[in-house]
Structures are given as C-alpha cells and as structure tokens.
Design a protein with these regions (language model features):
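Short alpha-helical "packing" element that flanks the helix-turn-helix/winged-helix DNA-binding module
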Residues: 25-33
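N-terminal leader segment of winged-helix/HTH proteins
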Residues: 1-4, 71
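Short, Lys/Arg-enriched N-terminal segment that forms or immediately precedes the first helix
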Residues: 3-19
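Helix-turn-helix DNA-binding module
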Residues: 35-46
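DNA major-groove recognition helix of helix-turn-helix
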Residues: 54, 61
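Short Lys/Arg-enriched helix C-cap and helix-to-coil transition segments
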Residues: 62-77
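Helix-turn-helix/homeodomain-like alpha-helical modules used for DNA recognition
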Residues: 79-123
Length: 123
C-alpha cells in the first residue's frame, strides 16, 4: 500500500488480496520484481525491509505451487477446478487496470468469485 494509505489496486483486487495468502505490500513487491509496475512506482520502504519482503513473498509463492502440485496430485483439486480458477484469474487480469466498476458490479464479481471458491473448496 502506498505511503498515504491509498491503495494502488482497484476494489476487486483489494478484496481478493485480503482473502489471499499475501499482503498488499507483498503483491506490490512481486509486481515490481516482475517489472509489472511502473519504474517510477515507489514502495517507500527501507532496502532491508524490501529484501525481507521479497524473500517472504518468494517462499509464499513456492509454498503455493507445491500445495497446488500436491492437491492436484492427490485429486483434491480436479482439473475442472483448475480450469475454473484459471478462467477466473483471466477475468481478474482484465480487471487489474480497470477501476471503473460500479459498486454493484464489484459486489456481483466478488460474489461470483467467492461462490466459485467455496464450491471448489467444499470437502
């Protein structure tokens, strides 16, 4: 999150981040490391804090990939579930730069995502 407390992400992305394993700062750092944020984008943190967050983010991403491999390998996550997740991720990708959503649309979008995740997670 930027120094002023104002988020660099639209409402949908903010809500997804809150439900994810990552903090908004970690997502900003990941995007900066992947050069997906402007070069003039400033994180306003010390060099030590930045590198600590990079290491934490890398470990979380590794853990996430190992978890996906494990859960798919054990058929806890089916290929159909993965397909749903990837299609939702594609839609989120399209929303990343677009903050022009009406509030009712934002709630609808989050409801669709929440319902899809709950359906996939039901054990």
């Amino acid at each position: 999150m930027s120094e002023s407390g104002k988020s660099n992400f639209n409402i949908i992305i903010q809500k997804i981040i809150k439900k994810s394993l990552f903090t908004e700062r970690q997502i900003e750092i990941i995007l900066k490391k992947k050069r997906m944020l402007d070069d003039d984008f400033s994180l306003n943190i010390t060099k030590g804090a930045y590198y600590r967050q990079v290491v934490q983010s890398r470990k979380k991403i590794e853990g996430l990939y190992y978890s996906i491999i494990l859960l798919q390998g054990l058929d806890v996550i089916s290929l159909d579930d993965s397909d749903v997740i990837f299609r939702l991720a594609e839609q989120v990708s399209k929303m990343y730069d677009n903050s022009d959503f009406m509030p009712e649309n934002q709630e609808q979008i989050m409801s669709v995502i929440d319902n899809a995740v709950k359906q996939i997670v039901s054990l």
